[in-house]
Amino acid sequence: MSHRDTLFSAPIARLGDWTFDERVAEVFPDMIQRSVPGYSNIISMISMLAERFVQPGTQVYDLGCSLGAATLSVRRNIHHDNCKIIAIDNSPAMIERCRRHIDAYKAPTPVDVIEGDIRDIAIENASMVVLNFTLQFLEPSERQALLDKIYQGLNPGGALVLSEKFSFEDAKVGELLFNMHHDFKRANGYSELEISQKRSMLENVMLTDSVETHKARLHKAGFEHSELWFQCFNFGSLVALKAEDAV
């Protein structure tokens, strides 16, 4: 059962950097719903994308799976035989709960839940890959290599779903959407102290990119088509397609 996120409701003397530890994992469903505008829409639409792109006899990768929300969404709309989902996260606390969540919902498509580093996982025979608010936690210098690996592991006609928090090249727009995001969190019951403390912990570990930067990386990796398909304030999701005639 998910608990309400009150992790930052009292002053913390030494904040440190953000980690996806046991305390975060325990309140994560509540935290992400109250912090990420449009999160439920993205999860629901990932299921629709899976129905369109997952092919028989292929694999789906959920890289940075957290508690498995995207994995479960994908699995609901897989109607082919011999498919498998591989869900990976480097947080032991997240993986422990993810396994419980996956096991609670029976379905014919098997799921391998792996505790590991997504940079070390081989991507093979993939028809769909999901990076749901994950890339932003990698060092910027490591992001291109991961996208290159995903492109190489995708079958022709495959899709990558890349959801992220965005920065903006237009400072005025960036400021507006930043403030609207904070209004969203206030409306969901977070205090100024909670918002400030969480932001301080995240600022050194979550480094955001613009949509233009994401699209440039995807093009460099080999994706012929990529576009923003969902956005709410400074959060959104892109889909990148590998050409059906790609070698």
From Swiss-Prot:
Family annotation (InterPro entries): CmoA, Methyltransf_25, SAM-dependent_MTases_sf
Pfam short name (any one): Methyltransf_25
Keywords assigned by UniProt, alphabetized: S-adenosyl-L-methionine, Transferase
BP GO annotations: tRNA wobble uridine modification
CDD domains, per the entry: AdoMet_MTases
Enzyme Commission number, as recorded: 2.1.3.-
Substrates-to-products reaction catalysed: prephenate + S-adenosyl-L-methionine = carboxy-S-adenosyl-L-methionine + 3-phenylpyruvate + H2O
Top-level taxonomic group: Bacteria
A GO molecular-function annotation: carboxyl- or carbamoyltransferase activity
Keyword ATP-binding among record annotations: no
Binding-site positions, S-adenosyl-L-methionine: 39, 64-66, 89-90, 117-118, 132, 199
Enzyme class: transferase
Protein purpose: Catalyzes the conversion of S-adenosyl-L-methionine (SAM) to carboxy-S-adenosyl-L-methionine (Cx-SAM).
Similarity comment: family membership: Belongs to the class I-like SAM-binding methyltransferase superfamily. Cx-SAM synthase family.
Subunit structure and binding partners: Homodimer.
Listed NCBIfam families: carboxy-S-adenosyl-L-methionine synthase CmoA, PRK15451.1
Protein name (record): Carboxy-S-adenosyl-L-methionine synthase
